[in-house]
Amino acid sequence: GYPVNDGFCCIKGLSLDKQQTVVKTSPLPKIRQADGSMKEVSWDEGFQYVADQLQELQAKYGRESVAGISTGQLTMEGFAIFGHVMRNYLKTNVDGNTRLCMATAVVAHKQSYGFDAPGYTLKDLELSDTIIFIGANPVVAHPILWKRVRQNPDKKVIVIDPRKSETAMNADYWYPVKCRGDLYLLYTLANVLIEKGWIDQNYIEAHTEGYGEFKEFVKPFTLDQAQETAGLSPEQILELAQLIHEGKRVSFWWTMGVNQGYEAVRTAQAIINLALMTGNIGRPGTGANSITGQCNAMGSRSYSNTAVLYAGGDFTNPARRAKVAEALGVDESVLAEKPTATYNQIIEGINEGRIKGLWILCTNPRHSWTNNETFASAVKKLELFVVQDIYDTIESAEECT
């Protein structure tokens, strides 16, 4: 079957026709008129209007007076063209709504591995003998992924989650960690694994650095204190540590329960450290694997639809800049020389009058931004607000120009 869904259709997609999601929008673009009404125009006229407005704003206020907010919902080709237009033609700021769900994982990946990319495929769920979900509920949130789990005939499913979620109900083991207790639990697990010698010393020496400092760091995280802080008994934590030790192909999976949680980056790094110290990384059925919330959040980072260089690199890294410029066939001077504005900085820039034009793509910040009243006040200050979406009924579309 197809490598992503293996021929399985997600129940969410199959149910769309039974929900209030029928696209009733006209296939033509619309431009707001002086009286506030929206007028349909041809695609050629719509394209020309947006292009002229963007160029006029940049000529009047400067290159960074316009910005874009992207999504995690496009194809790779869509991300590639949007990234190229914003980065290499308009040479301005663009970030994605994927920051709201994946910034934690991005930072953890870069600090742990040196680059932003989890090293796994969905096939690993079928090959792992010990599958550990942390702050994830794939039964509901990722049905296709869960189907892979069910196809695995030889696995133990472990869930670490304060809630007895649908996934916890289908698991072999459920550990109801206290809210805000997951980081302490993970550090305690690391300490237990080290004390019992349940680590892969050869892998650690060959592929990691800083192990000695990490070993000293986790020593204060004890079983007795974990019972109070993490809400799990010493027996439960020892059982979990033994399950990790006995597994031959252990995989750790996390999503928004970690990424939008307390000390999220540290928690994600702690998960990665467990995989590294036990040698459960880089082999089929293993890994510390961040599950994205949107279908192509990785694509947004790969094609610079977020505030990073192409392929999730840093704008200040000379080696990465040279490789990206070569791959794109452009002069290196075309690439931005500093980190560009993030989602929150774009909203701040609008409210402060520095950004005059905004182009959003398949996202609805008027509804989903963390403090959407700040966005509501911001859009009223824009001279140009372009909303690109299949639905003209979303809240952001009601504010567009």
Predicted regions and their residues:
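Flexible, glycine/charged-enriched surface loops at secondary-structure junctions
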Residues: 61-65, 199-204, 251, 282-289
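P-loop NTPase catalytic nucleotide-binding module
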Residues: 180, 184-250
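Conserved short loop/turn motifs at secondary-structure junctions
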Residues: 67-75, 228-232, 255-262, 294, ...
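A glycine-rich, hydrophobic/aromatic-adjacent loop/helix-cap motif
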Residues: 244-348
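Phosphate/diphosphate-binding loops
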Residues: 374-375, 380-394
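N-terminal export/assembly segments and adjacent metallocofactor-ligating motifs
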Residues: 1-196, 210, 214, 233, ...
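Short, conserved loop/helix-junction motifs that constitute active-site signature segments
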Residues: 149-154, 278, 376-381, 398
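Long hydrophobic segments that form regular secondary structure
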Residues: 236, 244, 342-360, 364-368, ...
